[in-house]
Amino acid sequence: MDNNNDFWKFSDQLRLESGLANLSLNDYSIWSNSYSSKRPDQRRNFDVKGSDFNNNNNSSKAFDDDFNDGWKITNSNGPLFSMPHNNNNNTLEVGGFNKGGGIYSNTNTTISSYHPNNLNNNAFGGFNKGIYSNTTSSPYLNNNHHHLDDNNNLNRNNLKGYKTYFKGEDQFHTPKSAKKKNTTNNTNNKKHGDNTNNNDGTKTGAEKKFKTLPPSESLPKNETIGGYIFVCNNDTMAENLQRQLFGLPPRYRDSVRTITPGLPIFLYNYSTHQLHGIFEAASFGGSNIDPTAWEDKKCPGESRFPAQVQVITRKVCEPLEEDSFRPILHHYDGPKFRLELSVPEALSLLDIFANQNSFDDIFKAIPA
């Protein structure tokens, strides 16, 4: 009994001590506002993980009452020291601080941000509203928040005083100087007629443009070529027949190479819109078989129609009018028709020519 009485006497003496506020734990006082007298670099952070200070079940009436002035020595029901009672049933922040009453409290924060519905059960949410709240004097307090998974908490912990020196477009987009440089390179490639990613600028626009025919102007790859139509006008037709050589512009070079000896050939005169036949390929299709044919005056030694093939006249027939042969051909882009003939198309044209009497037969039928 004597020991118990001595203990309670000692307890009463401690409660009356005026220097109780200076009692310290871990080299600093946590029991009174004398904690605020220390400099920020002398204050030690502490782990409130798992603490039960942040309670969301408290009444929202706490936000309309006065501030509680931090931790105070109060007469409580607990032994020696206890957490202060809040007679107004106010919500306590971490360390017992109410809204704005705690050390490093954010004076710029609105009342709505402290509503219990906005608080998080995570103790860290209350911690930032307590002694280490967000303030303009401590702009880098948000450095160690990555261990929390609550994105809502992180959003509320953004600092008003923190200023970033990088724009969003600098972090997620290509720098403007690099964009400009790439645009310049692409422009140079287009000027040289090179639409690929290589840096070879030696190709001319004509060579790139006329290398091959588009799919609409050529037969499908899995279809066999059955014949070919060459084109001329009134100025070039005589040279075609005299040289027994037909030619087309450079863009038809690859297409003409598919011609083999014995393939049916037809000649279309777009000045008269008539189709002449019947001719037969005497050579493989090639390029510049006779460079002097249709020679280009600007480039001596080069033909204006380098996609060439040698032919022989298989049968002289009356030319066909457009109405008779156009329904057979494959058309694209309006009146244009494909020069490469499939096997059915070539056979149909041969049948039409066969129904025409040759000039020789007509002359033989005339009596002398």
Curated annotation (Swiss-Prot):
Compartments where located: Cytoplasm
Inducing factors: Induced by infection with an avirulent strain of the bacterial pathogen Pseudomonas syringae pv glycinea. Induced by infection with the fungal pathogen Phytophtora sojae. Induced by copper, cycloheximide and reduced glutathione. Induced by tunicamycin, azetidine-2-carboxylate (AZC) and osmotic stress. Induced by dithiothreitol (DTT). Induced by wounding.
Keyword Protein transport: no
GO terms for biological process, alphabetical: response to endoplasmic reticulum stress; response to water deprivation
Sequence segments annotated as region (Disordered): 35-61, 171-218
TM region(s), chain numbering: none
GO CC term, one of those recorded: cytoplasm
Biased composition (Basic and acidic residues): 38-50
Keywords attached to this entry: Cytoplasm, Stress response
Origin: domain of life: Eukaryota
Domain called DCD: residue spans: 223-355
PROSITE patterns with a match to the protein in the record: DCD (PS51222)
Predominant localisation class: cytoplasm
Note: Overexpression of NRP in protoplasts induces caspase-3-like activity and promotes extensive DNA fragmentation. Transient expression of NRP in planta causes leaf yellowing, chlorophyll loss, malondialdehyde production, ethylene accumulation, and induction of the senescence marker gene CP1.
PANTHER family xrefs: DCD DOMAIN-CONTAINING PROTEIN NRP-A, PTHR46034
Known function: Involved in stress signaling pathway that mediates cell death in response to endoplasmic reticulum (ER) stress and osmotic stress.
Protein name: DCD domain-containing protein NRP-A
Organism expressing this protein natively: Glycine max
Gene: NRP-A
